[in-house]
Regions:
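A surface-exposed, charged beta-strand/loop segment in the N-terminal or early-internal portion
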Residues: 1-74
Length: 74
């Protein structure tokens, strides 16, 4: 499954060395949780501050499972 939407970052949790788990509120899909690989790197860290508006791409193997986000700051 794949979707693209705009949303606001509600929270983030550090996971492993370079990854984070984020919770976002999107316009079409509501509240969603997923992982961002490399989210705690120097280049990506500034994008993931609580309250930022993001353009999100979400991918998952199953609709009911947590997916993986890639994002851009709007």
């Amino acid at each position: 499954m794949h979707w693209k939407d705009e949303g606001y970052l509600l929270s983030k949790i550090n996971y492993d060395e370079n990854s984070i788990i984020i919770e976002v509120f999107t316009l079409e899909h509501g509240k969603c949780t997923g992982m961002v690989y490399g989210g705690s790197s120097r280049k990506q860290k500034r994008n993931f501050q609580v309250g930022n508006k993001l353009l999100l791409n979400w991918r998952s193997k199953n609709v009911n499972k947590n997916g993986y986000f890639t994002s851009e700051l709007i």
